[in-house]
Amino acid sequence: MARSRRRSSVDEMDVGGSATSEYENCGGPSFSPLNLSRPKKSTRGRSLRSAQAWGGKQLHPERSTPLARNDCGPSSKPRRRHEVGRSNKGLGASLDRTDEDTSQCPRIRASAIRCGASTRKIVRITGECDAQQGDSRPGRSEMAGWHSPPKRRRTPSRHGNSDNERSHLPRLSSHGVVRVGGRPLTQTPLQKTIILQPKLVRKVFMPTFTVNPEMHYRRVALGEIPKFGGAGSYGEVQIFKQTGLAIKTASSRSCFEHELAVSLLTGECSLRAQASLGIGGIICLMAFSLPSKQMVFPAYDADLNAYGYRLSRSGPPSVLVTESIERAFIGLGRALVYLNTSCGLTHLDVKGGNIFVNHSHFVISDCVIGDLSLMTLNTNSMAMRAEFEIDTGEEEIKTLRLPRSASQMTFSFVIGHGLNQPISVIADFINNSGLAKSTGPIKHDVGLTIDLYALGQALLELLLVGCISPCLSVPILRTATYYYYSNKLSVDYALDLLAYRCSLYPALFPTTPLTTIYGIPWDQVEGVFESIAGAHHREAFRAHLERYRLTHRRLFASIRIPSAFTGVLELVSLLCHANEKARLSIPLLWTPRP
């Protein structure tokens, strides 16, 4: 059939272009908006009508049914012809009348219009999807008679790029890149060389630090089931044995922010003490999560209480064990001196449950002090109003401010349960004076004497439970009547505790040239009388003292300390010395042992 400047008798939809369709020029298959295939026999009539309406060629012209003349009448108005000058082998958007067939059926014409509209709609949707996927077909051009998909307004940038994008910057995905602070915790964090970086100092005592962004994580994804490690008033601890981590979850937001702030300061001090002075014994924060209120620390084999109970069941300790114990506590004493004097940090909660050890056959290889929930800033601190900028992986940087309570002494935290405090603090509690009435930051020398005395009490507890009591017929306890007072600190219990110390310590503390530099190491009865103000309190103390002389005199007189424990007990007597000057100097901590 001739195709010069006229259409065929069967109207075809025109896509425009050259003699071949643009999709025939592509390397891929020909384009079909409805994904039509070869018509089946059962749908021959419908396929024929669709081919006539969409302009497709008849596959079997001999099977086509001719239209009757009386079915369609001639059109009174000639249809407008699209002058596109392109081939009609593809899809089209208009129906044109020809001179061979001047009479067209209105039903076919209406069907063609509907099909053309459907075609334009489908192709427009397909084009938008291709544009979103970034699929650029070679040789593709705008098609005549189609409604092009809406385009965003483009203006050339100063780099000559019409996509309003900077060509010199890498193109990011629509989801963005997760920053370091927003990643989950999937493995053991690497050992940090720096935790805090000073940024600026706005005012005195108000420095601003930038926290290492690698320390923050979004959630825990370690891939193992944790074990319960313990719980307290400020949170609970879970142990991940495979990765060697201990994750503490705070019970409240205020407790978490306080402990996190002091843990950041303590961790930075720990790194500097180890690098410059070779002082260890301070637990170092490894990672934390603000949304989860969690802090990550290295896990240890046991705390000091569990270590002492296991040691008591293993028999008399060897010389290697006692030497490792002494060496570990000398390191802890140096760490507390460094924290109180150089860093301005007072722990206030030194006890066996907060000291963690790694050991092999009870020979301690590593020992640190942890649980910084009660730590306070003393008068030597220069960061009482410090701020910490934390990158959590979000758009805005979070700012953590050190709470004011972190630098304000609370006497209830200082006195605690009364088990590990020196006589000066207990006397202030009994008399309701001194530290009980003090406000503001605690003095650094007072904080140091409190921490060192508590460290000596923890060492004494370990020796009594794990070393001395197994060798005696009747075990000796460090505190005899604490549970009689329902685990609550009262004036009567404080007087009872002082009377028990005056009865027990003369039987334990050695009197050597090292321990008697500043006088007798244990508390004297006369000194306790002088420290107690009220006459009725003195009478109560005298009554408790007479009772212990009647009930515990023979037991304490039967104590025989093996010579292997003399060096460790010297350290105990210095840490728990009645004279505060002996605790502040601690010659054993800084003098190399022969």
UniProtKB/Swiss-Prot annotation:
Superkingdom as given in the UniProt entry: Viruses
- Which amino acids does the record list as binding ATP? G229, G230, A231, G232, S233, Y234, G235, E236, V237, K248
Question: Is Iron found in the keyword set?
Answer: no
Task: Give the reaction(s) catalysed.
Answer: L-seryl-[protein] + ATP = O-phospho-L-seryl-[protein] + ADP + H(+); L-threonyl-[protein] + ATP = O-phospho-L-threonyl-[protein] + ADP + H(+)
The GO molecular function terms of this record are:
ATP binding; protein serine kinase activity; protein serine/threonine kinase activity
Grouped into one coarse class, the protein's main location is virion
How is this chain modified after translation? Autophosphorylated.
Entries under InterPro entries matching the protein? Kinase-like_dom_sf, Prot_kinase_dom, Ser/Thr_kinase_AS
Q: Which residues form the active site?
A: D349
* UniProt region (Disordered), positions on chain: 1-105, 128-183
Q: Which GO terms describe its cellular component?
A: host cell nucleus; viral tegument
Q: Which stretches are tagged as biased composition: Basic residues?
A: 38-47
What compartments host this protein? Virion tegument; Host nucleus
Gene3D superfamilies per record: Transferase(Phosphotransferase) domain 1
Its Enzyme Commission number(s) read: 2.7.11.1
| Keywords from the named record | ATP-binding, Host nucleus, Kinase, Nucleotide-binding, Serine/threonine-protein kinase, Transferase, Virion, Virion tegument
> What protein family is recorded?
Belongs to the protein kinase superfamily. Ser/Thr protein kinase family.
What miscellaneous comment appears in this entry? Displays a substrate specificity similar to host CDC2.
Q: What is this protein called?
A: Serine/threonine-protein kinase UL13 homolog
Q: Which organism is it from?
A: Equine herpesvirus 1 (strain Ab4p) (EHV-1)
